[in-house]
Amino acid sequence: MSTRTIETPIGLLTLQADEAAVTAIRFGADGAQDVSPLLDAAEAQLREYFAGTRRTFDLPLAPRGTAFQQRVWAALRAIPYGETRTYGELAAAIGSPSASRAVGMANHHNPIPIVIPCHRVIGANGTLTGMPAGWRLSESCWRSRGSPF
């Protein structure tokens, strides 16, 4: 595993990759600065995204999770930049219309936030809900800069 911490407009992010794919993005630092072409690409694409010059990512990803979580995370990647979906809409999109709470849990456990855009899912009442504390802080900073998700 290779790990690198980068500074971004929403705070420090730690990127993790194996030999073939990005496996995690975490809020905060672990101090590692490993050399890796894949981490170079991930860092460059994240910088472009935060600068507003990139709307999609073309990185190889390998999030670890259950088959259900994998389906949710694949559906998250299909939500276009600047758009949102409710948990119920996402549940219906994966063929499990009564599983909005389970979708919320999969969203909460997304190991590669930003690239797998869990921030584009909102509650039925239109509010951001169910996100980890670190993301909530970063999301409010991001919104204060006027950036769409």
Question: Each PLM stretch: what is its role?
Answer:
Residues I114-V121:
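Short Lys/Arg-enriched helix C-cap and helix-to-coil transition segments
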Residues H109-P113:
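Terminal helix-turn-helix DNA-binding modules in bacterial transcription factors
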Residues L13, V121-G123:
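Active-site and channel-lining beta-strand-loop segments
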Residues S100-V103:
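Helix-turn-helix DNA-binding helix
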Residues M1-S98, G146-F149:
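Basic nucleic-acid-binding alpha-helical/helix-turn surface characteristic of O6-alkylguanine DNA
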Residues A124-F149:
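…primarily DNA-binding HTH/wHTH and HhH modules…
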